[in-house]
């Protein structure tokens, strides 16, 4: 009878074979394994299986040699080599050489066992479920060298997928790995009978949370009777956790509580403290030191309304704003926010005081785009250069779309941001000037080979009006600074009047390309070129800046330090240091 080895293969051996791709573990000096030929996986597995051996005499090593030989055999079998030739010898120090005796095992792997046949079948309702059968691990495939770790992974993937999709009564009706070492072949048979797929039942919330059931039900994205999927439960947990209402969320959808294949969903909620206060100090070369603070009441009634106050203080800019927000359906993405704010700003030769009142309706489209419809009133008092102080009053309806795709919120390796906003006013609707205002921004980030990052940025803006001199500074365009064109002062790029005062432009055009190289954990160097300007005519010249920088990836996001040279002295280009922080996208 040919020897066979079943699915119950040594558990320890299967665990070790799963680490074949890890760097080799350092061994004690008293035992060494030498696998002849180019077999780094076998070498690593054998060394890992033996582990550390130390403080042994030569005689002790001789007694241990048989055990070590068996361990190496098991390690090689895990990767499909069942017929190795292993020789060992004891090397003792001689003459003036000092040190302990060493056991050296020399291994000739021999020919491997290959997979002769692979039979993987899903029976029952899961056989018609595309989510179940798709993308099962292709290895070990017919003709491959047998790898017990891959076989174990295939088996576990089927189990995990059944649990994730709700086939909780599933079982293997046949689970065999038959190996014939003499013929050097292996046959794999995995037949899984899924049973019926469970469904989700009603969602209930434990008492004492303080919110209306109608609000909480809006967080549930599935209907009773839908098929079970673990992702639906995880999404409910995440949405409730991110709502800002709760400090603890526990979603229980255990199949043990099911009746007739329907699982009731129970949600336990721990309400967070209703109010929080935060303050912080920051710095950028655009505005210098700044102080930020906010007070927020995360919920003020059972309907989940919230409100807050925010302020930012720096030498050139001071602002104070307050807001009141009402959640819509779904509350994770949709809301109405009422706001009011005051801002005072003095930059270069422009002074302004801005008072705003408005509302925003945020709505996420099915394709992932965020839509913001707004209506705000702005009253601005401003002075440009030595001109007299002027005032404007504008009622500005607006519409904006944005989308952010990134693989990490703080330090993504790839992704993009697209943002488009349009707003306007008309003298027939409580406004002092006719305006159509457009702003478009796109950023892209791509990482190649782990260490090479490429960032691009393009921004375009435009304002159409019957009388540009009546357009307030907050709706004109200025360029230059940390987040604009480096190598030039903050908002110094702009058309100028006959007194050389920057008055702001009708158009904004900015492009940037940056390369980063990661040379150490959390550290990158950068090289960049920026080009752009605030202009009155699209044919007007642009300013160019270039430079080098360094990036430190802090726990709160990247910190950027750049040294840039403005290449156009007629626009005020010079050597400048720029410091800023925040996500790349």
Which role does the model predict for each range below?
Residues 290-292, 372, 396-400, 421, ...:
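One-face residue pattern on beta-strands with alternating periodicity enriched for small/polar residues
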Residues 15-16, 26, 240:
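Cleavable N-terminal signal peptides
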Residues 21-23:
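N-terminal signal peptide c-region/cleavage motif recognized by signal peptidases
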Residues 29-40, 51-285, 294, 308-326, ...:
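Periplasmic polypeptide-binding modules associated with outer-membrane biogenesis and secretion
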Residues 263, 451-528:
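Extracytoplasmic gating/loop element in the C-terminal half of outer-membrane beta-barrel translocons
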Residues 2-17:
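Bacterial N-terminal signal peptides that target proteins for export
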Residues 125-131, 229-419, 446, 454, ...:
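Gram-negative/organellar outer-membrane beta-barrel architecture
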Residues 340, 359, 417-426, 433-466:
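Transmembrane beta-barrel strand/turn architecture of Gram-negative outer membrane proteins
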